[in-house]
């Protein structure tokens, strides 16, 4: 595993390393990509510190995989990798997204606004606790909120203009009573 801090500037979060599997250095990896089969084709992966990871073997299971990385030869070495986030460089991505697909990293920083143009805040992150993706919004008040990342709550994304439209009712930002303060 080489160390290269410069490589972190243009990264896309792709996976997280889980528990060891067996005694030969294999680990479970949760892949965040829509197509786990492509995981190995991305080539070299990087962690938060810029260390590189090269996949030697990979077996997929739904959105997870059992992976052996170069230089990880036993269970002890595999255990030391648990919890590491893996990134791929942007130029390594296969750019065949459909019109309604986005990389999460591209949405961070977009303005969040209502249909009428009122700016509510900006996208500052994503979460997924098992029931679907949630957008983390930093409201103009400084407060952070999680809203469902669905067509109902987020009916429109305008990447070129730098904003997305949110339906405040569907997103849970307002209750049933209109409150225009």
From Swiss-Prot:
InterPro entries: PRC_barrel-like_sf, PRC_RimM, RimM, RimM_N, RimM_N_sf, Transl_B-barrel_sf
GO cellular component, one term: ribosome
Membrane-spanning residues: none
Record-linked Gene3D superfamilies: PRC-barrel domain, RimM
Claim: Oxidoreductase is one of the keywords in the record: no
Domain remarks in the Swiss-Prot or TrEMBL record: The PRC barrel domain binds ribosomal protein uS19.
Name of the gene encoding the protein in the UniProt record: rimM
Annotated protein name in UniProt: Ribosome maturation factor RimM
Domain of life: Bacteria
Localization annotation: Cytoplasm
Family under the similarity heading: Belongs to the RimM family.
């Amino acid at each position: 595993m080489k160390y290269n801090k410069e490589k972190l500037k243009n990264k896309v979060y792709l996976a997280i390393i889980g528990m060891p599997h067996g005694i030969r250095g294999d680990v479970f990896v949760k892949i965040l990509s829509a197509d786990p089969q492509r995981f190995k084709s991305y080539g070299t992966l990087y962690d938060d510190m810029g260390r590189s990871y090269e996949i030697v073997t990979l077996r997929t299971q739904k959105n997870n995989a059992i992976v052996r990385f170069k230089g990880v030869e036993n269970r002890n070495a595999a255990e030391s990798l648990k919890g590491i986030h893996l990134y791929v460089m942007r130029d390594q991505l296969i750019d065949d997204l459909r019109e309604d697909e986005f990389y999460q990293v591209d949405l961070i920083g977009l303005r969040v606004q209502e249909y009428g143009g009122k700016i509510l805040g900006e996208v500052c992150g994503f979460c997924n606790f098992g029931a679907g993706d949630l957008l983390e919004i930093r409201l103009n008040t400084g407060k952070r909120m999680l809203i469902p990342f669905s067509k109902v709550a987020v009916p429109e994304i305008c990447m070129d203009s730098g904003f997305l439209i949110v339906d405040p009712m569907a997103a849970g930002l307002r209750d049933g009573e209109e409150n225009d303060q």
